[in-house]
Design a protein with these regions (language model features):
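Mature, structured domains enriched in cysteine- and short glycine motifs
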Residues: 1-68
Length: 68
């Protein structure tokens, strides 16, 4: 999956991608599941990770809404 496909999955809150990747938001320091009900962040503030552990190791914390 490329960046645009992952971002589109976030925009549509597509739960079928749960566990395939995690989205981290640089402006908030939080990482989420693709189906998170939180507002979709701006493209320039998003990084994608294959595991939650990778997002945590880069300093992001788990979202309190979707509990990844």
């Amino acid at each position: 999956m490329n960046f645009e496909q992952r971002y589109r999955a976030m925009e549509t809150r597509d739960e079928s991608y749960a566990g395939e990747f995690f989205a981290a938001v640089t402006s908030t320091g939080i990482y989420c599941r693709p189906g998170c009900p939180a507002r979709t962040p701006k493209r320039e503030n998003v990084r994608f990770y294959l595991t939650a552990a990778a997002a945590r190791s880069d300093g992001f914390r788990a979202c309190l809404r979707c509990h990844p």
